[in-house]
């Protein structure tokens, strides 16, 4: 194993619902021997509605505390939060780097029809997500630019 693959590593998986984050995050978890943090999974397990933003924020804070402990001891972590804002991605990168971790960003995107079809097929949302919400999300989501991607490390596993 090379030095870059044996050091602590944070993989941030970013994108809108239905973009394939969970599929990629599970793959990264297996390939890297990482711990994957997904608020959706925890909320499902705890019987919390996925639209409960206060609970989601608390879960993400707890997940980040655990992730930092893992990174500080040389572990590998996959964050599957969506990370819609550049400021959030920058903060994760900065904090992980301060712990000596390499940090990679995986940005996933898909057409609105594909996002809607995937979200509808999985049927996790209650109430169901209306199609118009996806257009609103695309407007709110800050897609990573080449400028933002530059300070991230090269992913060990390509998307």
Predicted feature residues:
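ATP-dependent NMP and nucleoside kinases share a basic, alpha-helical "lid"
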Residues: 45, 83-126, 140
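Conserved Rossmann-like nucleotide-binding pocket used by diverse enzymes
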Residues: 12, 37, 79, 106
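A structural preference for long, well-packed, hydrophobic secondary-structure segments
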Residues: 13-19, 27-28, 51, 86-91, ...
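Pocket-edge positions in alpha/beta enzyme catalytic cores
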Residues: 51, 55, 84, 126-129
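Glycine-rich phosphate-binding loop used to anchor ATP phosphates in small-molecule kinases
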Residues: 55-104
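Glycine-rich loops and low-complexity Gly/Arg-rich segments
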Residues: 36-38, 60-63, 102-105, 129-133
